[in-house]
């Protein structure tokens, strides 16, 4: 090894790669008739890391590592309760999408088109959780975008290419990785066309945004500013091809059931006509009959509907499903709060009647699974406030009276029970 400080040799040594002399670099490592400097070694390491990362993306999506639809469904079952048909549809769609990416480089007469996904279901039914779980399972970049914040380019608000910028941020601006990621666009129903009638005011967050999303979802070269930058004319942009990004759009689509019912249940005339009440069928059952024409009537443009060929509907969660959500998933709320209490060396017991009360309260509020945490948080607020300063508490018991606000949690001490908040 030679370095620039101790070089009194007659002949000056040079790096065989960059041509710098031993006086211009910190270290010069000798091989058989060749030399390499420390700067070239660092550059080689950087190239190897980048190539290894790109190879990792390819390897993670290879056929051998890609879980089967049944395996995807089994993993979704661990995190999402109910919605069996939606999980089955998603498992098949995601499997086919990444299987298609695996065979992109192979020459074939048949080209496989991308199948983006539309999730239709009420608030708190599990749409976002399903998309998050899929991304975590496949180890691909994932971003959630809110359609209500999007506007047409040139107006105040976020333009659609901001979605791709967030996706890049989530994978440290590795373009290859981002181009195989998953984008979940929430509240897609909120950008429906407001009316069939023309208006003098421009609908900058309705049809215009749908048109802008159309290109992104279909596949285009999105221009994204460099890290942390804003768009201005005289800068270089990062080009991201969205052709292989899987887009999952979700929305509650309030009022869509009426559109479907009006189409499917025609009123008969005469003695032989079948009279059927519109209230007989469950909303989830009605949504399963959704057709593209219903979505067009709701306010989505036909071109966007055509780019979302896979439609999965989620039903409203009933009391039994909400009770299961509280205790069964890997990250169940009850398990989370039990862990919080365990950090104080206290056991938390939430009785079945309390779970039932939480589920009923969420149904009354019409918040679905999303409202469960706030109900439990409210019920446990006082005891979580007092617990760190209380001595000798070994167990806290929650019943339905605590959830309904008619009672206090029962604190079990080493010797005698005591009610929280009592003197």
From Swiss-Prot:
Disulfide bridge partners, by residue number: none
GO BP field: cell division; proteolysis involved in protein catabolic process
Domain of life: Bacteria
Membrane-spanning residues: none
Residues annotated as binding ATP: 122-129
GO-annotated molecular function: ATP binding; ATP hydrolysis activity; ATP-dependent protein folding chaperone; protein dimerization activity; unfolded protein binding; zinc ion binding
InterPro entries: AAA+_ATPase, ATP-dep_Clp_protease_ClpX, ATPase_AAA_core, Clp_ATPase_C, Clp_protease_ATP-bd_su_ClpX, ClpX_bact, P-loop_NTPase, Znf_CppX_C4
Keywords carried by this UniProt record: ATP-binding, Chaperone, Metal-binding, Nucleotide-binding, Zinc
Domain ClpX-type ZB, first and last residues per copy: 3-56
Ligand binding (Zn(2+)): 15, 18, 37, 40
Its job: ATP-dependent specificity component of the Clp protease. It directs the protease to specific substrates. Can perform chaperone functions in the absence of ClpP.
PANTHER family in alphabetical order: ATP-DEPENDENT CLP PROTEASE ATP-BINDING SUBUNIT CLPX-LIKE, MITOCHONDRIAL (PTHR48102:SF7), ATP-DEPENDENT CLP PROTEASE ATP-BINDING SUBUNIT CLPX-LIKE, MITOCHONDRIAL-RELATED (PTHR48102)
Listed name of the protein: ATP-dependent Clp protease ATP-binding subunit ClpX
Protein species of origin: Burkholderia mallei (strain ATCC 23344)
Native organism taxonomy: Bacteria, Pseudomonadati, Pseudomonadota, Betaproteobacteria, Burkholderiales
């Amino acid at each position: 090894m030679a370095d620039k400080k101790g070089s009194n040799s007659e002949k000056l040594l040079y790096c065989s790669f960059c041509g710098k002399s031993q006086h211009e670099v910190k270290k010069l490592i000798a091989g058989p008739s060749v030399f390499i400097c420390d700067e070239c070694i660092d550059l080689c390491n950087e190239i190897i890391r980048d190539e290894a990362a790109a190879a990792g993306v390819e390897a993670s999506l290879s056929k051998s590592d890609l879980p089967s639809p049944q395996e995807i469904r089994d993993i979704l079952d661990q995190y999402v309760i109910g919605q069996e048909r939606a999980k089955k549809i998603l498992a098949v769609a995601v499997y086919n999408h990444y299987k298609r990416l695996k065979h992109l480089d192979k020459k074939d007469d048949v080209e496989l088109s991308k199948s983006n996904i539309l999730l239709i279901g009420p608030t708190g039914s599990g749409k976002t959780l399903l998309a998050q779980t899929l991304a975590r399972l496949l180890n691909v970049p994932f971003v959630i975008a809110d359609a209500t914040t999007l506007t047409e380019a040139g107006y105040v608000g976020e333009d659609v290419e901001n979605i791709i910028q967030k996706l890049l941020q989530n994978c440290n601006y590795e373009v290859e990785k981002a181009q195989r990621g998953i984008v979940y666009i929430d509240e897609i129903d909120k950008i429906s066309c407001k009316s069939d009638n023309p208006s003098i005011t421009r609908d900058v967050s309705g049809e215009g945004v749908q048109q802008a999303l159309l290109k992104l979802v279909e596949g285009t070269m999105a221009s994204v500013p460099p890290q942390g930058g804003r768009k201005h004319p005289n800068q270089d942009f990062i080009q991201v091809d969205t052709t292989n990004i899987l887009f999952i759009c979700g929305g509650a689509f309030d009022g869509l059931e009426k559109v479907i019912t009006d189409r499917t249940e025609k009123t008969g005339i005469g003695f032989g006509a079948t009279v059927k009440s519109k209230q007989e069928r469950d909303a989830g059952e009605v949504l399963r009959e959704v057709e593209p024409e219903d979505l067009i009537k709701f306010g989505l443009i036909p071109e966007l509907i055509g780019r979302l060929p896979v439609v999965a509907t989620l039903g409203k969660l009933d009391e039994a499903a909400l009770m299961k959500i509280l205790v069964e998933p890997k990250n169940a709320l009850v398990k989370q709060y039990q862990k919080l209490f365990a950090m104080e060396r206290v056991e938390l017991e939430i009785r079945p009647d309390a779970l039932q009360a939480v589920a009923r309260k969420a149904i009354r509020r019409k918040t679905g699974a999303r409202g469960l945490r706030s109900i439990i948080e409210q019920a446990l607020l006082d005891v979580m406030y007092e617990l760190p300063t209380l001595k000798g508490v070994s167990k806290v018991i929650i019943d339905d009276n605590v959830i309904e606000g008619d009672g206090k949690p029962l604190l079990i001490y080493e010797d005698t029970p005591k009610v929280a908040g009592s003197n």
